Amino acid sequence: MAMAGGGRGDYGAFMERFVLPPPPSQQLPLHGLTFAIKDIFDIAGRVTGFGNPDWARTHAPAAATSPVVLAALAAGATSLGTTIMDEMAYSINGENTHYGTPTNPCAPGRVPGGSSSGSAVAVAANLVDFSLGTDTGGSVRVPAAYCGIFGLRPSHGLVSAENVIPMAQMFDTVGWFSRDLSTLSRVTKVLLPLPDDIVKQPTQVTIPMDCFQILGSLDDRTYQIINASVAKRFDSQILDNRNLGDFISDNVPSIGKFITDFSESELPSVPALSVISHVMRGLQRSQFKANHAEWVNTVKPNLGPGLRERILEAIASGDNESLEDFQAIRAEFKSALAALLKDHGILAIPTVPGPPPKVGMEAAPLENFRARAFSLLSIAGLSGFCQVSIPLGMRNGLPVSVSLVARHGADHFLLNVVEELYQTLIDEATKTWSS
């Protein structure tokens, strides 16, 4: 039986609880695993809610089920229902005015991250083994970091987004969460059937100090932890500690006309990364408008505070003469990052610029945090490269994470490296934080 509206007994993670059973076979690769589905994936016969009651009210039940949901079921997993998300996928915060904010299991009183908030919470609270989300600007990576779990944003375009409500197709990426690497690997082999990559050691690991300075405080010492872990597990000779901002400035010439706009920030920032973020958000806004302006203008939906202003700004934005420049920067950036990482290089960066903000944080400090977050999130976002957020544990009662990024299509290599490095990361974090 379906139950609408997640109760707080499930940490407020679920929109609707129901069972979608797999085929009756114990030989399937995901047999015995349960999963939850972000309320952005179509399920035949059910209305896809997209985080907003007016959207649900004005849309018919889906005619077909998302291929990625079908793939998980066909591989033996059992779905336990759909999860709450931020309205129209236009937030990385995780708060929903209409359905309630899912409770962050590892940091109550802090936001769970969005827009795949319920999917992350369902995994972190041990309600399911894995869950499906989407990531346009950070909506898998951020909730994973805030909830202390693994989150994979695959290479853009490699997992079908058919029968998934679009936010901005240029960046929309289906991803997934798990509590452990074994499950993450099992799910990835099913949902991302790329050729196996047997390489487990990177040829280079770039750990840019300027990206870690965006944190504003190095108290969690993740920069030292990742450097020590790579040197110990692999070889210090493969460490590359260049500044990513300088690399971008030198290799993405089209950012020149925008760079001065971001050179006077009082926030901890990297101007070149601020431009990359500006470009991605501009392109995202343009595509969101093309997808949803007609519905917003016709229905005039009830939208939550903060998010309402962001959506209406996107809808009201004119044809931006900078879009051609933005596309040029996107192409140059992807090419430059590919040249940096080559086939088997890794980029290590913070997933987010600090601990999860408190629920109900005031708008100004929250916007500052968002700006710094997108400087980091736009690296994989604009390039389309794959990224996995790795939980390092709790520091002062709050979750800490780090991310590894690899070139487009190197998803299985990326997971190989995570599997090789993870225990060393945990050991180094434990040792560093206890000293």
UniProtKB/Swiss-Prot annotation:
InterPro entries: Amidase_CS, Amidase_dom, AS_sf
Entry keyword annotation includes Cytoplasm: yes
Localization of this protein: Cytoplasm; Nucleus, Nucleoplasm
Temperature dependence: Optimum temperature is 27 degrees Celsius.
Catalytic activity reported: a monocarboxylic acid amide + H2O = a monocarboxylate + NH4(+)
Entry's Gene Ontology molecular function annotations: amidase activity
Main localization of the protein described in the UniProt heading: cytoplasm
Enzyme type, top EC level: hydrolase
Assigned EC number: 3.5.1.4
Signal peptide: none
GO cellular component: cytoplasm; nucleoplasm
Keywords: Auxin biosynthesis, Cytoplasm, Hydrolase, Nucleus
pH and activity: Optimum pH is 7.5.
GO biological process, any: auxin biosynthetic process
Keyword match Nuclease: no
Active site: 38, 115, 139
Function text: Amidase involved in auxin biosynthesis. Converts indole-3-acetamide (IAM) to indole-3-acetate, and phenyl-2-acetamide (PAM) to phenyl-2-acetate. Substrate preference is PAM > IAM.
Similarity comment: Belongs to the amidase family.
Protein name as catalogued: Amidase 1
Organism: Oryza sativa subsp. japonica
